[in-house]
């Protein structure tokens, strides 16, 4: 693991009216590290990742990326710098195939008889390459995503992030609504990301998954950071106590 954080959150606060959604939160993420972000509903997890990814702007504090202070105007600017977010709904188009989803909004074009048309062959070929890097096997790249399992859909979302050279991947409840076998596949994918040097922020209510995949755990409660530890140095009982304030 690198000694230099790829992402630093420094004393970040965010208010919505009179509500402190985040209050003086700091944390670091290193390349090739899986950092779990734990907390109950309303703890501030979603607000924090939206500040990092450019959806919200912090009222106070700083975000540093590769050592430089950054302010992302919107999520697209964050993606252009290599920060990708996979939300629980995956933001995939069920009626499109794998290649079209990997290139969604960034479709390559070619000219046929002087007219611009989608280069579907390139999209499918490069999508296959991206999934192959993660050892993901999908037999039919020409089928719409609605025909695929939840685990395969999650894999396509991860493959899309890797294809666009993500250096930081934020994953919001990636194993929610999946069966146990598919949860295991997603955990294996996250471990593959770690091996490739991607820094992963892993948001989950599932402590079993957190302990299976993370290197460190940060716990939020009511907008404040109340705990941070190496995963191997704690247990689920301690994490739950931090979450509920016991």
Regions found by a protein language model. Give the residues of each.
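Glycine-rich phosphate-binding loops of nucleotide-dependent enzymes
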Residues: 2-246
């Amino acid at each position: 693991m690198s000694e230099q954080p790829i992402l630093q959150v420094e004393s970040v606060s965010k208010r919505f009216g009179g509500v402190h959604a985040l209050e003086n939160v700091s944390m670091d993420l290193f390349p090739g590290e899986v950092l779990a972000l734990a907390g109950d509903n309303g703890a501030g997890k979603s607000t924090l990742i939206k500040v990092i990814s450019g959806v919200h702007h912090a009222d106070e504090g700083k975000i540093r990326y590769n050592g430089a202070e950054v302010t992302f105007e919107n999520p697209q600017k964050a993606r252009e710098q290599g920060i990708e977010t996979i939300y629980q709904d995956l933001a995939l188009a069920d009626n499109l195939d794998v290649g079209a989803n990997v290139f969604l909004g960034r479709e390559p074009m070619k000219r046929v008889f002087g007219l611009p048309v989608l280069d579907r062959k390139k999209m499918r070929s490069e999508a296959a390459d991206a999934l192959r890097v993660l050892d993901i096997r999908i037999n039919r790249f020409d089928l719409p995503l609605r025909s695929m399992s939840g685990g395969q859909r999650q894999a396509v979302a991860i493959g899309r992030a890797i294809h666009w050279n993500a250096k930081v991947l934020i994953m919001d409840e990636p194993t929610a609504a999946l069966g146990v076998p598919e949860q295991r596949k997603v955990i294996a994918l996250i471990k593959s990301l770690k091996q490739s040097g991607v820094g992963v922020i892993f948001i989950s209510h599932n402590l079993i998954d957190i302990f299976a995949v993370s290197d460190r755990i940060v716990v939020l409660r009511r907008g404040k950071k109340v705990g941070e530890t190496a995963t191997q140095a704690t247990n689920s009982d301690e994490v739950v106590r931090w979450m509920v304030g016991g």
